[in-house]
């Protein structure tokens, strides 16, 4: 008997329910494990210019990681929503964030930079799969951003957000790497970057 594939909307709803049952402490432990794994990768060690994200309450927490990476001497960039697109803006500390925007997300203030400076992109997701496909929130912000750059990409989620299959569209492009607290999935062609 064949089971019907979930739609993007159904998968988003299922993950939302699971997120609601996941204690905050568990998310922070998983985030710590995820980012410690990334910090051991060659791509992170060699990258000076890293795009991360300032996490929302339902995303893998990044606030401490972003601060720690900045203190370690990395140049950190965060996205800022402008219309239907994301601008990339340098992060200079919590004082440079503004949450007075449409989504009430901590976004960096200042001038945007070109994506060509980025050497690594950390990507949030609602769900990821073993083929490194990503399900976002449905607005296409990261789809558009990632289509404009060839920088290495790492998708990060809690373990329960790694699913059997993410529904994809013809324009969707898989990420280079997926990291959860106990799983690393890498594009074989780019494997050397993520060791």
Model-assigned labels for residue ranges:
Residues 84-195:
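Conserved phosphate- and dinucleotide-binding cores of soluble alpha/beta proteins
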Residues 2-116:
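N-terminal active-site beta-alpha-beta segment that forms phosphate/nucleotide-binding
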